[in-house]
């Protein structure tokens, strides 16, 4: 953010917080290019960095200044009068630059909030594994949980409208509408994997989608925090940011005439917890199923009336935590009783007491993981290892390095499993698939190839943590056994591996 704060101070005084003029500045595209070189593993490099040049950007800006050529050609699929023969490249450059521009208000707000709260900038706060200690602390005391799939907006205009609270510049919003109308079918968001997360413009659409989710969560969490005060009072929600909330004395129907078709009564639940990752969230509560059903139907009406997004109640599943497990972030988590026997002695009498405590159990999803490995041809659907034929043309070191990297990533991510037996089975599949791939390359049998290499090949699959612990402690020590049995949550995991995401 510091790299363009100087530019922002200049344009604030001249343009009254307008972001639109920045689209004509070359340094914006230079920033987008530099960020593309250092982008996270979530965003794949699709060739924009190789094709981008200062000459192309200058040509693009000069064409944007020529307003006579700013024409919409809906029927032309690959070229138009504005972009000529480089429509795909120009559209990608504009989307990258526009994403940087629209991120400016969010970045400024983030910097100011970090200064106010004196929060230390740390990647540990972004770790996915930090969610599971929260589960261990809160969920054993709760009774019910609902899996909530956040619906995708049907129309791109919904995504544009969510930006109007942060982007005060109408010209920027109109430019975004024009860009989306020119290059995307407004009605294709029903199949989000093909449109909203297209690799060529993933940064822009992630920004739009995250702003939509942020808008939804800001209202939801506000209601959750205020629900304790609304036990006996009918209250209306005004979804404009200026008058966000007020208590009312007149009937609720008058307030909800535009947003809700019926009276909405709030309810008290001080033990409700909310967790989300990407488009899936979990709403857990200690109260009765009736209360969870109220939240369920409230969310459905909320999406339909405020965001104009159609959602069915069947998309929200309510389960009892003690009887059902929930799938979140690649783990199958459940609450099970942990009974410990305590011996108590009073004078001459002694007796045993069973102390039952609830504990979070995080299991490795063996069946979905075998399905993921079968999709990428590491094994068959039964879990029997097979050779990776597409890698047989690579060098031996490259083949081994690929398998070791996949096994290490899975071991690192699933280090929090309560039972490691299923994880060891997956590592065995990867080891044997690696050996079969090498044997196929050298036109040999697996047994002959293993005899030639010896146990050194299998030692490559031990993670760095396992190697360090095996050197520090003997294999029979209790510390090493606790390492293999216990759960470890790492604070450096920022995204889910493709094999972990089974959907």
From Swiss-Prot:
GO terms for cellular component: chloroplast. One of its GO terms (biological process) is mRNA processing. It comes from the Eukaryota. The keyword tRNA processing applies. Signal peptide: none annotated. Its main location: plastid. It is found in: Plastid, Chloroplast. The keyword RNA-binding applies. Belongs to the intron maturase 2 family. MatK subfamily. This is Maturase K.
């Amino acid at each position: 953010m510091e790299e363009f704060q100087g530019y922002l101070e200049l344009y604030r005084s001249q343009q009254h917080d307008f972001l639109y003029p920045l689209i004509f500045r070359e340094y914006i595209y230079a920033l987008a290019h530099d960020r593309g070189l250092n982008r996270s593993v979530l965003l794949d490099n699709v060739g924009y960095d190789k094709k981008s040049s200062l000459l192309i950007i200058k040509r693009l800006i000069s064409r944007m200044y020529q307003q006579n050529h700013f024409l919409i050609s809906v029927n032309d699929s690959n070229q138009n009068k504005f972009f000529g023969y480089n429509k795909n490249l120009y559209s990608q450059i504009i989307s990258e630059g526009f994403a940087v521009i629209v991120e400016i208000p969010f970045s400024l707000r983030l910097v100011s909030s970090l200064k106010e709260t004196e929060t230390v900038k740390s990647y540990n706060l972004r770790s996915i594994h930090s969610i599971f200690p929260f589960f261990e602390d809160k969920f054993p005391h709760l009774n019910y949980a609902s899996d909530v799939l956040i619906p995708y907006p049907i129309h791109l205009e919904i995504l544009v409208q969510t930006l109007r609270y942060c982007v005060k510049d109408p010209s920027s919003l109109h430019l975004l509408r024009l860009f989306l109308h020119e290059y995307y079918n407004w009605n294709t968001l029903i199949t989000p994997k093909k449109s909203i997360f297209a690799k060529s413009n993933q940064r822009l659409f992630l920004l739009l989608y995250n702003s939509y989710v942020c808008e939804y969560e800001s209202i939801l969490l506000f209601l959750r925090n205020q629900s304790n005060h609304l036990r006996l009072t009918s209250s209306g929600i005004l979804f404009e940011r200026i008058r966000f909330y007020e208590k009312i004395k007149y009937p609720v129907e008058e307030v909800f005439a535009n947003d809700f078709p019926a009276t909405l009564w709030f309810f008290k639940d001080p033990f409700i917890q909310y967790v989300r990752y990407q488009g899936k969230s979990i709403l857990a509560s200690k109260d009765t199923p009736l209360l969870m059903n109220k939240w369920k139907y409230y969310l459905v009406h909320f999406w339909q009336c405020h965001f104009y997004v159609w959602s069915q109640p069947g998309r929200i599943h309510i389960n009892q935590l003690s009887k059902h497990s929930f799938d979140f972030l690649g783990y199958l988590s459940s609450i099970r009783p942990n009974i410990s026997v305590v011996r108590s002695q009073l004078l001459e009498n002694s007796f045993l007491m069973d102390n039952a405590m609830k504990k979070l159990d995080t299991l490795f999803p063996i069946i979905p993981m075998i399905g993921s490995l079968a999709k990428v041809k590491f094994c068959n659907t039964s879990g029997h290892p097979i050779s990776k034929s597409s890698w047989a043309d690579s060098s031996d070191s490259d083949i081994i390095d690929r398998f070791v990297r996949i096994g290490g990533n899975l071991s690192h991510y699933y280090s929090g499993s309560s039972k490691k037996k299923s994880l060891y089975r997956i590592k065995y599949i990867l080891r044997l698939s690696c050996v079969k791939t090498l044997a196929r390359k050298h036109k040999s049998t697996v047994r002959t190839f293993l005899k030639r290499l010896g146990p050194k090949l299998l030692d490559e699959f031990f993670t760095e943590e396992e190697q360090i612990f095996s050197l520090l402690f003997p294999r029979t020590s209790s510390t090493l056994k606790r390492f293999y049995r216990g759960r470890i949550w790492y604070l450096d995991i920022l995204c889910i591996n493709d094999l972990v995401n089974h959907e």
